[in-house]
């Protein structure tokens, strides 16, 4: 059966969720909580982009993605840096 899938995106920049690649307006200070919210609201999958610019930020983003994965039950796809 074919059906449409709801796949929200979280863009992580400096440990926070921002609006878009070129719009760094903060949507949430807690990306883990945001991922859980999307999961609980019925998303089919979660797409996460790491917009970090340094190795330190990248390592922090990876840690956040691991934490996100622990609190959601839907598949997560990640990309970026």
What are these regions (language model features)?
Residues 1-72:
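Conserved N-terminal beta1-alpha1 strand-loop-helix module at the mouth
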Residues 74-81:
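Glycine-rich beta-to-alpha transition loops that act as phosphate-gripper elements at the mouths
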């Amino acid at each position: 059966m074919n059906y449409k899938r709801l796949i929200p995106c979280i863009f992580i920049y400096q440990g926070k969720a921002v609006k878009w690649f070129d719009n760094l307006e903060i949507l949430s200070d807690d990306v883990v909580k945001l991922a859980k919210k999307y999961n609980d609201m019925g998303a089919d999958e979660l797409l996460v982009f790491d917009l970090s610019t340094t190795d330190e930020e990248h390592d922090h983003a990876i840690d956040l993605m691991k934490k996100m994965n622990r609190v959601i039950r839907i598949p997560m796809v990640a990309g970026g840096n």
